[in-house]
Amino acid sequence: MADENIFEAKDESQIILPEDENPLRNEIKTAPLTKLNFSGTAFLLEKNHAKTRFFTTADMVSDAEGLIHSGFVFMGANYAALLAINEEFCVSIGARINFFGPLKLGDVVEFDAQARFEESRKREVKVVGHVKEVKIFEGTFQLVTLEEHIFVTQQKNIQKEAAIRQKKEREEAQAKNNG
């Protein structure tokens, strides 16, 4: 079943949803609403380590030859990186990646993600992707783990910057009036 594409069923009674194919779904804390048919499913989840299986589908095809768009491959690798850390408020902030070969419709990629710098909020995760024995992807992702949702953190930073700016403007106006 490892190389079987679960999305290419012949009739609806044979369809296996990615959510059903993901036995670790209850252990996953990060990115809970991610569409697994675009990101892959976890089959190994350990501290600082995750392995996922990424199934290529017709929705990912970019030309008549069945070439899979590299953006989907990146998403699958990024999801594996997130799972290696597996914290609720973890977001990607950078990546250095290499594609070593194209994917075609029907290919199944296994991503192996290893996280480093466990004691730090800013983490680095190395992700390698193989189709069978052939390495097709390698990348290093930078992720940050936050104490709250990134939008909450962002809003607090905006408010803090606004307060600093307003204070500076008041001080400048007061200096102008006194000078």
PLM feature spans:
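A generic structural signal for short beta-strands and their flanking turns/coil linkers
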Residues: 48-50, 91-95, 109, 121-123, ...
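A structural signal for short, well-ordered beta-strand segments
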Residues: 52, 95-99, 113, 127, ...
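HotDog/MaoC-like acyl-thioester-processing domains
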Residues: 2-22, 89, 104-105, 116-179
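Hydrophobic beta-strand-centered segment that forms part of the acyl-chain substrate-binding groove
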Residues: 79-109, 115
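Catalytic strand-loop segment that frames the active site of acyl-thioester-processing enzymes
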Residues: 30-68
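Compact, glycine-rich, soluble single-domain proteins
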Residues: 59-78, 82, 94
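Conserved beta-strand residues within beta-sheet cores
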Residues: 35-39, 94-96, 110-112, 124-126
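Short, solvent-exposed helix-to-loop capping segments enriched in aromatics
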Residues: 22-32, 81-88
